[in-house]
């Protein structure tokens, strides 16, 4: 008897001798049958030993590796029986169950495997169920069919977060009804998950017959409420489901509801296009089958297409019910006069004036213009329009202006004037135009636009006195504007009321600082032929004191003095102009007037003053003119001196100045004077280059782009430029 047998005999209840015995025969030449006999003795002796059974089951399962489960079914069945025997006493061991299930999944025994899964779930504690269910799910995925559905249902009880995966798996297997139920459960739990809704709706759309609780119609209707921005696509899905189920009338009802309740043009377009396509398919089918209903369906399709612009208008009006523009677009769709009138009536009744988006007055005006040929009705509409409490006075003014213009165009100018006059009459003249607490009707008499139109109207159809009274009323209401000032002054001038005209100009100057200069200009032009010199001088001095830099005032003042024969006074005015407005243009004007009145020689003081006062660029230009003037007078030395003096203002890059000087020396100079010119030009060139260099360096330093100091040793030989020979500044090369 071997030592192992002796150990077992001496310790019959101890598992360790059996383990040692089994381990010793694993790799020796003992046959599989002998090993099996040993395992049988061991598990018979110790039937509750997990280790012995695990070793035995691993050994027997391993013997089946590579064997065809159909050809060697008997061998597999013996191992199955062995697993069953082990589980009699070891039914609480999850590893044995899992190993058994894995072994069964190798065999074509679907019913047996399902039975073992159920037994495992019944035997093991709940905490171990997920392990079994994961393996069961692999089995269900492999075999598919109702088995997979049932396993999935049990699996998601343990793993509820896997319901979406379950739905995907069921869809792949073709169990649309079960998948839809799972998706509905997910939606009820998760709320507004649009991805799940899309998946559910697509699933419904792909299924011809689908019975759900709640019904499909209720499900999609719920989706429309939850996702209003997807109303169009969801409506189309519902209609298509009904079409596939043969319920065409219900599908039409869904389409009709979709196009009449859509809140966006996008949703409307989606539903309408699907609706039209649906009707076209029906018409095509009826025509192909020569159905007598074809003509009726064609007529209904045509009517649907004709309704499209009106339905789109409905959509826009549902979104913007108070939009004046959208109502105008709606009205423009109608061709029948009765329908147009009904649309206008609906529009003005639907838009509360306080909430109007846009000018409500334009709607009333266009309605009145619709009745342009029926004066009585048009005026009635205009009258009603004046009673509407608009948001702004401007809108009410638009109505009165349109009404008055309508009457004027129809040669009823008395009514045209009367309409505006009545609008501008108010017992309370002290209200503020901008007081929004008052109605537009209470403030309309402060409308500048209406008063302006009224003044033009009275001036065209009334008398001078009536027009004057209008302007006086405007002034009394503190509604005067610069334009009113000009218009009123022009009216007074045309009727020879000059003193009153001057008073109007003076009032305008005192009221409007921003426009005072323009009013002064008009005032002085109009006053010059009509007032005495002393009074005019006072006016000009007053204007110039307020606008000392306005060149036009000096020119106008100087012209007055010249026209009155007081040329020297005019020159003093022009001199003052150049003191306050230092530009080349003012000096040139002064020079021009001096030449005309006193000759060329008299301009020397003016030129001198210009060269002292003007910036370099302008001084250079005037210096050139000055030198050429002296040349004309034969003053060659003076001209040369001026050229030299003006060179300090003139950059040599300005070719015009030095070219003129060059020609002058060629014509009148000597070799010495020419050399002097070149020396001066070179000196000025150096001066300008130095100025440019310093300006550039300063700019680079400010920007931080100047290169830092570099040691001499670091300069590479190839970067050293040859030295420049020192030039003699006094050496001049002549190129004559």
UniProtKB/Swiss-Prot annotation:
Role description: Involved in pre-mRNA splicing and cell cycle progression.
GO cellular component: post-mRNA release spliceosomal complex; Prp19 complex; U2-type catalytic step 2 spliceosome
Subcellular location field: Nucleus
HAT repeat positions: 1-27, 30-62, 74-106, 130-161, 246-281, 339-373, 377-409, 428-460, 462-494, 496-529, 531-563, 598-632, 634-667
Regions crossing the membrane: none
Gene Ontology BP, a term: generation of catalytic spliceosome for first transesterification step
Source organism of the structure: Yarrowia lipolytica (strain CLIB 122 / E 150)
Coiled-coil residue windows: none
Statement: the UniProt record of this protein carries the keyword Repeat: yes
Domain of life assignment: Eukaryota
Protein name: Pre-mRNA-splicing factor SYF1
Record keywords: mRNA processing, mRNA splicing, Nucleus, Repeat, Spliceosome
Entry-linked Pfam families: HAT_Syf1_CNRKL1_C, HAT_Syf1_CNRKL1_N, HAT_Syf1_M
InterPro entries to which the protein is assigned, alphabetical: HAT, HAT_Syf1-like_N, HAT_Syf1_central, HAT_Syf1_CNRKL1_C, Syf1-like, TPR-like_helical_dom_sf
Entry keyword annotation includes Repeat: yes
Family: Belongs to the crooked-neck family.
Subunit structure comment from the entry: Associated with the spliceosome.
């Amino acid at each position: 008897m071997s030592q192992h047998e002796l150990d077992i005999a001496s310790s019959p209840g101890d598992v360790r001798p059996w383990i040692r015995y089994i381990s010793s025969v694993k790799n020796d030449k003992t046959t599989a049958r002998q090993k099996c006999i040993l395992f049988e003795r061991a598990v018979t002796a110790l039937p509750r030993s997990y280790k012995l059974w695990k070793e035995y089951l691993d050994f027997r399962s391993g013997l089946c590796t590579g064997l065809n489960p159909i050809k060697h079914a008997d061998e597999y069945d013996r191992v199955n029986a062995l697993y069953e025997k082990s589980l009699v006493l070891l039914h609480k061991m999850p590893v044995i169950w899992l190993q058994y299930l894995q072994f069964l999944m190798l065999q074509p025994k679907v019913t047996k495997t399902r039975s073992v899964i159920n037994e495992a779930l019944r035997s093991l504690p709940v905490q171990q169920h997920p392990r079994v269910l994961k393996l069961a799910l692999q089995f269900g995925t492999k075999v598919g069919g109702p088995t997979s559905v049932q396993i999935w249902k049990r699996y998601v009880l343990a793993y509820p977060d896997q319901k979406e995966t379950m739905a995907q798996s069921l869809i792949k297997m073709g169990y649309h009804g079960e998948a839809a139920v799972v998706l509905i459960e997910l939606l009820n739990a998760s709320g507004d998950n649009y991805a799940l809704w899309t998946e559910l709706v697509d699933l419904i759309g792909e299924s011809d017959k689908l019975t759900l609780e709640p019904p499909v119609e209720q499900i999609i209707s719920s989706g429309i409420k939850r996702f209003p921005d997807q109303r169009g696509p969801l409506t189309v899905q519902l209609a298509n489901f009904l079409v596939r189920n043969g319920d065409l009338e219900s599908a039409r009802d869904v389409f009709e509801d979709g196009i009449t309740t859509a809140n966006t043009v996008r949703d409307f377009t989606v539903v309408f296009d699907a609706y039209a396509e649906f009707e076209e398919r029906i018409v095509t089918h009826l025509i192909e089958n020569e159905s007598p209903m074809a003509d009726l369906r064609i007529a209904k399709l045509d009517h649907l297409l004709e309704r499209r612009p009106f339905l789109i208008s409905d959509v826009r009006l549902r979104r913007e019910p108070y939009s004046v523009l959208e109502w105008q677009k709606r009205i423009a769709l109608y061709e029948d006069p009765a329908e147009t009138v009904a649309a206008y009536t609906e529009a003005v009744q639907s838009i509360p004036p306080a909430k109007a988006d846009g000018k409500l007055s334009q709607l009333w005006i266009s309605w009145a213009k619709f009745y342009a040929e029926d004066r009585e009705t048009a005026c009635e509409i205009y009258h009603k329009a004046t009673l509407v409490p608009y948001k702004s006075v401007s809108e009410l003014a638009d109505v009165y202006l349109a009404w008055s213009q309508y009457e004027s165009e129809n040669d009823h100018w008395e009514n045209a004037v009367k309409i505006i006059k009545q609008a501008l009459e108010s017992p309370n003249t002290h209200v503020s135009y901008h007081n929004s607490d008052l109605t537009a009707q209470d403030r309309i008499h402060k409308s500048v636009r209406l008063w302006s139109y009224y003044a033009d109207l009275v001036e065209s159809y009334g008398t001078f006195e009536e027009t004057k009274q209008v302007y006086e009323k405007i002034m009394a209401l503190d509604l005067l504007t610069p334009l009113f000032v000009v218009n009123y002054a022009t009216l007074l001038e045309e009727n020879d009321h000059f003193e009153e005209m001057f008073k109007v100009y003076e009032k305008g100057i005192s009221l409007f600082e921003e426009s005072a200069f323009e009013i002064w200009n008009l005032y002085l032009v109009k006053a010059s032929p009509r007032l005495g010199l002393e009074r005019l001088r006072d006016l000009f001095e007053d204007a110039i004191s307020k606008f000392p830099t306005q060149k036009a005032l000096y020119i106008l003042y100087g012209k007055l003095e010249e026209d009155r024969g007081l040329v020297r006074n005019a020159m003093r005015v022009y001199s003052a102009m150049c003191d306050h407005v230092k530009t080349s243009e003012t000096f040139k004007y002064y020079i021009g007037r001096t030449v005309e009145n006193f000759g060329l020689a008299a301009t020397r003081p003016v030129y001198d003053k210009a060269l002292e006062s003007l910036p370099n660029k302008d001084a250079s230009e005037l210096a050139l003119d000055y030198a050429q003037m002296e040349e004309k007078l034969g003053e060659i030395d003076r001209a040369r001196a001026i050229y030299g003096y003006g060179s300090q203002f003139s950059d040599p890059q300005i070719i015009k100045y030095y070219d003129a000087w060059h020609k002058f020396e060629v014509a009148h100079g000597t070799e010495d004077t020419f050399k002097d010119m070149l020396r001066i030009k070179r000196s000025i060139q150096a001066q300008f280059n130095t100025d440019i260099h310093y300006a550039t360096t300063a700019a680079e330093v400010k920007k931080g782009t100047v290169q830092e100091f570099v040691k001499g040793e670091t300069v590479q030989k190839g970067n050293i430029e040859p030295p420049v020979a020192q030039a003699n500044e006094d050496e001049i090369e002549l190129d004559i």
